[in-house]
Amino acid sequence: MFLTTSCVDLTQEPQSFITEEEYIARMDLTSLQQATTGLYNDLWNGNYGFNCRLQRINVCADDITYRAAKANNELANYYRLTPNITANNADYKTTWELFFTVINNANKLINKAVLPEDATLAKQYEEVLGEAYFLRGLSYFYLVRMYGDLPLILTEEDAATNMP
């Protein structure tokens, strides 16, 4: 003899179906700080603030110069800003994509984080979000130095439809 039971009135939403928007809106301060740290990680993955990418960007701005010690030196392309450089150039493409990754991820945090009602805690949230604003601005600063005029994308929706 088999007995079965069921719970007809169960309306609990499965946690695996939480959207990115809901997740960001539910973040506590520690989670928001960790997400902002992820923006720094996006920069590190491209070696921007710490290694070769910063050198490339500074060559464009004439802050440093390169030594043409070998043929096909990537820095020569940055120094000369030659017209034959296209999006097919892997180095330029990587630079473009990684900075826009930082911009898009910063936009998600800035636009979807929900400030708590407690004024002290809200101030701490704003400080963390200030870092996201800064990193988005820094990314645009470097991109403008390299590529000139760019569209200003401030929302995730704009990034989905207008990614340059």
Language-model segment annotations:
Residues 33, 41, 73-147, 161-163:
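Conserved, well-structured interaction surfaces
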Residues 44-50, 66-67, 139-149:
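Secretory-pathway/luminal and periplasmic proteins that interact with or process carbohydrate-rich
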Residues 23-24, 59, 81, 85, ...:
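Short clusters of hydrophobic/aromatic residues that line enzyme substrate/ligand-binding pockets
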Residues 7-59:
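Acidic, glycine-rich segments characteristic of secretory precursors and extracytoplasmic regions
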